[in-house]
Amino acid sequence: MNGVAFCLVGIPPRPEPRPPQLPLGPRDGCSPRRPFPWQGPRTLLLYKSPQDGFGFTLRHFIVYPPESAVHCSLKEEENGGRGGGPSPRYRLEPMDTIFVKNVKEDGPAHRAGLRTGDRLVKVNGESVIGKTYSQVIALIQNSDDTLELSIMPKDEDILQLAYSQDAYLKGNEPYSGEARSIPEPPPICYPRKTYAPPARASTRATMVPEPTSALPSDPRSPAAWSDPGLRVPPAARAHLDNSSLGMSQPRPSPGAFPHLSSEPRTPRAFPEPGSRVPPSRLECQQALSHWLSNQVPRRAGERRCPAMAPRARSASQDRLEEVAAPRPWPCSTSQDALSQLGQEGWHRARSDDYLSRATRSAEALGPGALVSPRFERCGWASQRSSARTPACPTRDLPGPQAPPPSGLQGLDDLGYIGYRSYSPSFQRRTGLLHALSFRDSPFGGLPTFNLAQSPASFPPEASEPPRVVRPEPSTRALEPPAEDRGDEVVLRQKPPTGRKVQLTPARQMNLGFGDESPEPEASGRGERLGRKVAPLATTEDSLASIPFIDEPTSPSIDLQAKHVPASAVVSSAMNSAPVLGTSPSSPTFTFTLGRHYSQDCSSIKAGRRSSYLLAITTERSKSCDDGLNTFRDEGRVLRRLPNRIPSLRMLRSFFTDGSLDSWGTSEDADAPSKRHSTSDLSDATFSDIRREGWLYYKQILTKKGKKAGSGLRQWKRVYAALRARSLSLSKERREPGPAAAGAAAAGAGEDEAAPVCIGSCLVDISYSETKRRHVFRLTTADFCEYLFQAEDRDDMLGWIRAIRENSRAEGEDPGCANQALISKKLNDYRKVSHSSGPKADSSPKGSRGLGGLKSEFLKQSAARGLRTQDLPAGSKDDSAAAPKTPWGINIIKKNKKAAPRAFGVRLEECQPATENQRVPLIVAACCRIVEARGLESTGIYRVPGNNAVVSSLQEQLNRGPGDINLQDERWQDLNVISSLLKSFFRKLPEPLFTDDKYNDFIEANRIEDARERMRTLRKLIRDLPGHYYETLKFLVGHLKTIADHSEKNKMEPRNLALVFGPTLVRTSEDNMTDMVTHMPDRYKIVETLIQHSDWFFSDEEDKGERTPVGDKEPQAVPNIEYLLPNIGRTVPPGDPGSDSTTCSSAKSKGSWAPKKEPYAREMLAISFISAVNRKRKKRREARGLGSSTDDDSEQEAHKPGAGATAPGTQERPQGPLPGAVAPEAPGRLSPPAAPEERPAADTRSIVSGYSTLSTMDRSVCSGASGRRAGAGDEADDERSELSHVETDTEGAAGAGPGGRLTRRPSFSSHHLMPCDTLARRRLARGRPDGEGAGRGGPRAPEPPGSASSSSQESLRPPAAALASRPSRMEALRLRLRGTADDMLAVRLRRPLSPETRRRRSSWRRHTVVVQSPLTDLNFNEWKELGGGGPPEPAGARAHSDNKDSGLSSLESTKARAPSSAASQPPAPGDTGSLQSQPPRRSAASRLHQCL
């Protein structure tokens, strides 16, 4: 609460009648036999959490004892005990009361049962009574892993039940307005009980007539005063005063208060005889009294009193039901003289500022009643003997017909009553004050007062004029012993204008009252001319010295400041005239004379400022501005200044009334005003200059926050003169006067700066200025910014204070500062200051685009520290031209790289969204943008954004969302926004499916029973932590929205799962085995969540556990374990346990088909669509020519794999197979057996499962499998570059088990060629020959060299492959035609975008190329063989022909291009050229099986 100790005062319940014959409790006046439903404290055991600690925070209040309990203490001490025997005497003192401010949800305190509002009673068995707030905090912090708290629950705490409005609504803000507008306290409901009326009468009842039975008999009660018909004779008044104070004093007549309510409002420990009070009020009173009795510790030697005396209810408790017609005072203070004469009216709320010695509230006393602590031992015997004691009122109760005496003054104007507190800082001050100061005639009845008072008229009932009577106790009883004086308290008044009061060491109080005529009754609303107020003491006596628990007090304050009640946060200065006189009985006060304030309440407001300035300061200002709290220079006293602008801004108009008008017109102008104590105002003239002196200054920002030019940014020495609304800067000093003012207003000559308007400005120490000392910053209302350097720290602080006090805007009411308006001004200031920064993208124009998101970011940035917010943008570079001599501590680091705030942090630490605090702001913002503009964007989340732009946005968001410009084109690209969202989840330290539950999700996805699988997944999702569950729910809901528009954006749940599966379902560690093994599960999990998001994240539980899928729905368990042996090792060519990566991917696809996956067949079919269509076209063309070639047989043989069947073509001749040509060259490639007898093995490439499977599934959303083939075959491209001819294959692709290879997808050469620059260059060289060859004869069917046919041939069954052997001439002719066709395809293909090439290039990093044992067949040897003579070109072509039938058509193209360029087609009869061909075919066939 920033050090403001809100005082819970008074006791709210109404008095209730109580049978007097009931025996009273030992301390609280309640019967011990009567049951009460109050259960007492509870004990809780808290266990410390390493993250949250104990999980609660505290707040602190100072609670004062009820008036009834305090009065009872005084009464019992005066009486010496009701039973006649001595009882220990005790004191009721204010307590430091600690409540629970906040309890973290699901924290240790919350689980233990601690709730907000509970009051601490004990900490680890030690009572908090007698301990300060800091001591209690230390007890808690020093606890081990467990903390035992004894608390009073909020619902059972009487203090909070009685003062809930005070405690929770008005604790942090000053009350403004008239006292009668204070609301009524909330009602308190207790079981009502009825009590019989009292059976015995008291002498008190006979003295005070009771017109109605509802009126209480206690004249101190406002209800008693409210009855106009009530007349109290002087003797009775004297007796009543004796009964309450131990002395005789008159009370005001009821006529003086005709406006007061007649309802009984007098809370007492027990009701007076004849009064009827509701029983519920009585029980509340009893409970509170009982609580106070148990809480307040007794001191040794004190006596216990068996009963409590009646007590007048505080007006602040009654919410001023007794308020009279309003006096022209707009402000309510806590200790104003409510007990004033009738014509003044009770306009101020009385707070129960209880006493430690006098144990009485100054406000609650009647206008004529006040007692010094030294009278507290006066026995109550005077009450018993009051009938025979002569009436001795020093001032009669003025009736309606008699005006009050002019010299009388309300008790609250007499001063404050201090107290001895448990806080050490309070007790250190009590030794300075020992007595009360009285300045009013009510104390004439005390034997120690010498009164000089004008005669007063008395009502007719008064039997005799007032006279001084010494009560039974002697003066010796009124003087405390020396050992007790240190703990005594004083009643003292803070006069409105802060004049110094000198102390005299007199023991006895002497009050002299001026002879002034009594004021007429009709002037009840006006100023009391006969009243005078003593001037205020120095700052040591002011409320500025009140310590607050949340901030340490300076030793200088503790040693020199005088004791003031903490409840007097708002001072009780009155608009009344001072009284001439001295008080010799008080060693601490002398009263100067003279009036110096007017009716405009400026003096009252000025008197409240010091305490509030102290309240809003923090510990940081003391530590950073050492000695800032007190500076004394020739009588000047500097208050502590807050170190933050906003906290002062909120109360600016409250503390500063802007001008010295009221001070200047005062009669005592020589006494410096408290609010101008920094300036030497005692020597000030009546000119308009408030402060002047030499300063260095430079201007940082001009109007509208624009950066000042270089000429204005230089330090200059000027003479500054502060006036009411401006700060003039000149090169030379000018004498004060009208001429100087006019010259300053004309201002600014050539070399002088224009006057700086300080209206509504912000001024504070420039903490960011490290190059110069004693610099303060001034920002005007039009956002001009200046830096000023003072001579020393005192001078700097004086300037700051003077500017603040004179910067109040016109029309601002200092007593009614509008916090909302101030906040709006600060927000406007921040917005403009943000726009004035050097960054272009922080322009305010950015707020016009996607304003909702902009406001989201601004809301989040508004929660940052006030220090960084309040510094304008220009402050970061305002010291560029300053000298390079830093000093002190650089509080704000410049260009400090902040920790990331959005990316790479845990979900719990991300900035939360406004609609859901557990969803990161960046996730909500990106999803909102995509849903607003990208629901119909084709391929949203599939098409990536520019990596550089995404990275720049990440850096910007990591710096904080405050400077985001949504008009920037980077925020307009939907693909960038979608990539930003994916990047956020990719960079999470712990994935959305947390590490500890990752394996559970994978296992759950592999459950065959569909219903059980769904239930298990749902349970696992529900078990995720809160932030992860809410974020997953939000994201899946967003993806469901995207999938609902799949007709336009083409992003079905399956496609979205391919994008988000590897990102969301993963582990923190990139494990290659998990990638290969779990990749299909990751896709399936995300797809299932999107498809059934409503069921997974529904709030209601299904009683029947119904699942959205049938129990017979199969679950695909992808068979990709064959990839695991290939991770990190090379498999021999003939290893039957291995398989090629490409064939393995086909195999894994094929394994899904029998499981009836929804898209298994599509994944197989889409990859063949384009190739099949092209084959059919070429087949029809070839049949039209009537040619029977091996190409026809190849096409027909491939039909079963492609979905078309032609059994008749199975017997057609095929290209040469390795088994048939092996004997022709046994020397070259003899080792392996026929490849068709063993499984294929990949000896070339080991591709990571993530890349293989990603490219495998990526074909799902590709219309013609272009994306899949391009990305998936990049590895083949790389192999072709490194070992292009070694992988040469022919139509022997069919070698190997046909059943396993029938589902092998085909790859088109125009998909594989874009990244193969080597093949492109070779094809460019061979294009003329190829084209000529292609056009040289009739169009033949697609040769084996075509991209599509080469892959299709691999799917031919082995039997068909062995049955057909085309002639060598046919093979040569088809080879040439295939070369021409491929070159044509390369020329017609569409170039790929840079982004596609980059992705393929990244995919290639997963490929590891190894050497093969087939080193005899490499490109160099092939070139040597091809160049050996005429047969070699044909051999080369035939060799290339073999290559074309393999799966890796890209490699065949690379090998084929040089062959076509190196030689012409040979003659048909040239058969010798093919002698070396069969061995090469055999080797190529073996390699093809591996591939």
Swiss-Prot record:
Regions of biased composition (Polar residues) lie at 1138-1148, 1245-1257
Q: Which residues form the PH domain?
A: 688-808
Which segments show compositional bias classed as Low complexity?
Answer: 1345-1366
Q: Which UniProt keywords apply?
A: GTPase activation, Isopeptide bond, Phosphoprotein, Ubl conjugation
Tagged with keyword Transmembrane: no
**Region Disordered: start and end of each range?**
15-34, 204-280, 385-407, 449-530, 831-851, 1126-1155, 1175-1367, 1420-1491
Q: Which residues form the Rho-GAP domain?
A: 905-1097
Q: What's the protein here called?
A: Rho GTPase-activating protein 23
Concerning SMART domains, the annotation shows: PDZ (SM00228), PH (SM00233), RhoGAP (SM00324)
What does the tissue specificity note say?
Expressed in placenta, prostate, hippocampus and brain medulla. Also expressed in brain tumor, salivary gland tumor, head and neck tumor.
Domain PDZ span(s) in chain numbering: 71-155
User: Cross-link Glycyl lysine isopeptide (Lys-Gly) (interchain with G-Cter in SUMO2) - where?
Assistant: 854
User: What's this chain's function?
Assistant: GTPase activator for the Rho-type GTPases by converting them to an inactive GDP-bound state.
